[in-house]
């Protein structure tokens, strides 16, 4: 028994030494480097897609030169490295830390832009790619948070070089948010929950009136009113549909759940 315990203890000790050696390797190699050299090497690793190594060097730089301007930039670059390495949660945590520590930093526009990008590119699942689904099938929470980040960027920094791209992405996100609501409305119609479907359709018409989902929302609303035995409201809705979408196929044929792809009902 003593021999076994001794062997285990020795093995743990050797393992600890090996781990310590691995952890300290970069620190030892870089111990005489200036802040400029550390940052340049980290950037080289980042540009070479060696994201784990880049993050290590950024962390060493920040711990060794915490008051330098390179330390602040390293925090942002760390977030970008995590983003490129598909470490979304770590990227968001790094961005939020930077915003908390440096609320008046001149690169705050980039921090907001990067936060929006991380959330914008989230949820690219296998099924999403397989079925070629559109953005309305993404997580609405990610859509809303991405929109909020881009909106804050545009409002606070309208002259930022990132503002134009952020605005374009916001348009896509608004359409996606309308699509999120449409997916729910379709689901309720399929289930025969006509009041809930009508409420969702009204929300789209009121809050997402510049999206491509308004026409279908009116068709759903008309049918829901008919199912609820509200002929006057159904007729009013049809007039709105005729006025705004005179060539709509829903004027010839009512909305049918059978027209929807099967994956549209997934959430």
From Swiss-Prot:
Keyword terms of this UniProt record: Cell outer membrane, Competence, Lipoprotein, Membrane, Palmitate, Signal
Protein name, per record: Outer membrane protein assembly factor BamD
Entry-linked NCBIfam families: OM_YfiO
Chain's role: Part of the outer membrane protein assembly complex, which is involved in assembly and insertion of beta-barrel proteins into the outer membrane. Required for efficient transformation of Neisseria meningitidis by species-related DNA.
Family: Belongs to the BamD family.
Membrane topology: Lipid-anchor
Lipid-acceptor residues (N-palmitoyl cysteine): 17
